[in-house]
Amino acid sequence: QQLITFVSQSVLDFLPEDVKVSQELQYTLIKDDYYKGTGNQVLAMNNGKVIDVKKQQVTILDENGTEITFSKLKDIQVKKFQKIKQGDTIALYQQKFKMIFEYLGKQITYQEYLGM
């Protein structure tokens, strides 16, 4: 967990300290950690940086230090270490996609994330 915190803080050094988090983009919980949006695009909810990209999965470290892992994706449109802005397209999905939120090494819910 110390390594994750160190890496998270190192990656976030490029971001300004006093940034207001906007929660304009929201998704609907289907079941468990599966969500859907209004279209077929997964959009970044906040500014941040892509810290991992796999076959159907992207992990983003956002400006408040939360790691968001999106999975069950199609046509990933970001690359590892790419800076992203709120509203940028991360990937596409078909019927649903999975989102996992982790803050300071602890998994949090989507609702907790929105309240940050």
Question: For each of these PLM feature ranges, what is it?
Answer:
Residues 80-116:
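Conserved, short, structured surface segments that act as functional micro-motifs
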Residues 38-40, 49, 66, 106, ...:
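Intrinsically disordered, low-complexity regions
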